[in-house]
Structures are given as structure tokens and as C-alpha cells.
Swiss-Prot record:
Function: Cell division protein that is part of the divisome complex and is recruited early to the Z-ring. Probably stimulates Z-ring formation, perhaps through the cross-linking of FtsZ protofilaments. Its function overlaps with FtsA.
InterPro entries, per the entry: Cell_div_SepF (IPR023052), Cell_div_SepF/SepF-rel (IPR007561), SepF-like_sf (IPR038594)
Highest taxon, organism lineage: Bacteria
Annotated transmembrane regions: none
Species in which this protein is naturally found: Latilactobacillus sakei subsp. sakei (strain 23K)
Entry-linked Gene3D superfamilies: SepF-like protein (3.30.110.150)
Name used for this protein in its record: Cell division protein SepF
Biased composition, class Polar residues, residue ranges: 21-38
Known partners and oligomeric status: Homodimer. Interacts with FtsZ.
Family to which this protein belongs: Belongs to the SepF family.
Keyword Cell cycle: yes
Organism placement in taxonomy: Bacteria, Bacillati, Bacillota, Bacilli, Lactobacillales
Length: 144
């Protein structure tokens, strides 16, 4: 091979020393010792022991049931809360409690239905907005 390669010569431009590369002597070998492992490899036993995240379904009937929902959140479990079996005033109090709980643990709370809420701890990510999807479906049915 030639001693020097130049992009400017290759493209027919004038010689510019900033872009020239010496191709001789650039031969390197990466040797890996038998005792070291690359950082991107994990043990299969470690992958098999991964803990599954859980989503808990709750239908509170009295205000004190909110404590159970809070405990699930503290255990890093997502909770779907259905308020169809409780009075509106009690549901409002529970939502206030859960909003505070979710704020304290740096989680999220999102309405996913008329009387259904999703509460997630910080290790979950809520992607999308269900009301946008519902509004789009309503729009599609009105157009057709």
C-alpha cells in the first residue's frame, strides 16, 4: 500500500495536511485476557434471576383501602385503581392520598378511564395518553 492516503487527493482537491492519514503503522490488535470479560456481557444466571415487575388491580370500597394501594406503590408495583364501587367523595379523597403518595416516591398517576387511574412507581414509564386515543376514535367514528 502507499505510505499516505489523502482525502483531498482522492476527491481531486488540493493537498490539505489536516485530512491526510498515515496508513502504515496503524495496525493494532486488541488482545483480551482469558480472565477478563467485556462489560456488555452478562451472566445467564444473573439474567434468569431478574425480578418481574407487577401490576396490581384494586377496587377500593372504603377510604382505608387507599393504604393498601400505597403499600403496593412502595413495593415498586404499579397499581390500576378502579373507583366504580365507591362514592365520589370517597374516591376523591383516595385520589388525593394517592397523588401525594406518588409525588413522594417520584412516581406518576394518570387517568386511564372514567373512574380508573394508573399509579406507577418511578421504575415504570407511562408512554402515551389514553384520552388522545379515545378522542381520535371518537373523531374517526364521527367522520365515517
Amino acid at each position: 500500500m502507499a505510505g499516505k492516503f489523502s482525502f483531498s487527493n482522492f476527491f481531486g482537491m488540493t493537498e490539505d495536511e489536516d485530512y491526510s492519514t498515515d496508513l502504515q503503522g496503524t495496525k493494532t490488535t486488541d488482545e483480551v485476557s482469558p480472565t477478563s470479560r467485556p462489560d456488555n456481557i452478562i451472566s445467564m444466571t444473573a439474567a434468569g434471576n431478574a425480578k418481574m415487575n407487577k401490576i396490581v388491580l384494586c377496587e377500593p370500597r372504603i377510604y382505608s383501602d387507599a393504604k393498601k394501594v400505597g403499600k403496593h406503590l412502595l413495593e415498586n408495583k404499579a397499581v390500576i385503581v378502579n373507583f366504580t364501587r365507591i362514592e365520589g367523595a370517597q374516591a376523591s379523597r383516595i385520589i388525593d392520598f394517592l397523588t401525594g403518595t406518588v409525588f413522594a416516591i417520584n412516581g406518576e398517576i394518570q387517568r386511564v378511564g372514567e373512574q380508573i387511574f394508573l399509579c406507577t412507581p418511578p421504575n415504570y414509564e407511562i408512554d402515551g395518553n389514553l384520552s388522545d386515543i379515545i378522542d381520535q376514535n371518537d373523531f374517526d367514528s364521527e367522520v365515517n
